[in-house]
């Protein structure tokens, strides 16, 4: 799978992706998605001020709901080797419906499924302030009525491929901030863009530290746990949460210190 994705599929399947598709694209990811949101908010403020609206969308049971035949038809437009296409179809058909979770081939295919909608939002509706990470996406606009109409268009486009928005989808004032990729990003009245950690992410971090402690007591390697924690820490430090991270650092040190004292 790794050789298939890295050696062949990646270039073929990512070719039609828009700039603001962040998942499973080299050089992008969550950090890029957050940076682009900050850029968009700054640009929006300079053009329109602090008043505006956000359409925030999420798709119901995305991976499980993707039509296998439809996504394979889309892939055929870009995969020029019949043998590779046959192997890709074999991976997709490992489950009776949707895309198999955990397979590397599923990530670019899931992105490809929404590619036409991406282009329609960007190029037909001319939405500059649009970003998507897999099935989580937002549009910032000055006109609430425009976003209501756009939501109907998105719903129709999704229905045509057997998908639908979930109940979390909503239109709300830009002043509320946008929850995206584990953070809430908002603008002050003066146009300063601020990023803070979501409460759910804080809770997940605390649970993660308890899990690290249990892993360490069960015999997991110190280096393995530290590597996992550093990766999570690097992502969370993109928000305004230095105090929280310092407390978590101290807790991690205590875990290793207590174990060493008991040896």
Residue map of PLM features:
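Conserved polymerase palm-domain catalytic core
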Residues: 35-134, 138-155, 163-168, 172-173, ...
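PAPS/PAP-binding and catalytic site of the sulfotransferase fold
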Residues: 4, 154, 158
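Right-hand nucleic-acid polymerase module
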Residues: 2, 91-94, 148-149, 165-263
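Residues immediately flanking
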Residues: 6, 57-59, 183
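Generic structural signal for hydrophobic core residues of well-folded globular domains
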Residues: 7-8, 12, 91, 141, ...
């Amino acid at each position: 799978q790794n050789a298939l994705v890295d050696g062949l599929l990646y270039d073929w399947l990512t070719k039609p992706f828009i700039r603001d598709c962040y998942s499973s694209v080299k050089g992008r990811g969550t950090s890029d998605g957050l940076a682009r949101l900050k850029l968009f908010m700054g640009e929006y403020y300079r053009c329109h001020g602090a008043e505006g609206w956000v359409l925030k969308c999420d798709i119901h049971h995305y991976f499980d709901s993707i039509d296998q035949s439809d996504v394979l038809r889309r892939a055929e437009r870009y995969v020029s080797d019949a043998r590779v296409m046959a192997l890709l179809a074999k991976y997709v058909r490992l489950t009776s419906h949707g895309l198999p979770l955990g397979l590397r081939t599923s990530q670019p295919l899931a992105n490809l499924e929404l590619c036409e909608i991406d282009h329609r939002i960007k190029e037909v509706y001319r939405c500059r302030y649009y970003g998507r990470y897999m099935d989580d996406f937002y549009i910032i606009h000055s006109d609430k009525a425009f976003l209501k109409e756009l939501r109907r268009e998105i719903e129709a486009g999704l229905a045509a491929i057997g998908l639908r928005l979930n109940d979390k989808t909503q239109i709300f004032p830009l002043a509320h901030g946008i929850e995206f990729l584990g953070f809430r990003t908002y603008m002050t009245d003066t146009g300063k863009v601020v990023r803070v950690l979501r409460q759910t992410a804080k809770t997940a971090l605390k649970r993660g530290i308890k899990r690290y402690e249990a892993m360490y007591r069960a015999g997991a390697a110190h280096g393995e746990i530290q590597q996992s924690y550093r990766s999570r820490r690097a992502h969370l430090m993109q928000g305004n949460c230095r105090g929280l991270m310092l407390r978590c650092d101290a807790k991690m040190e205590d875990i290793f210190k207590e174990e060493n004292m008991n040896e």
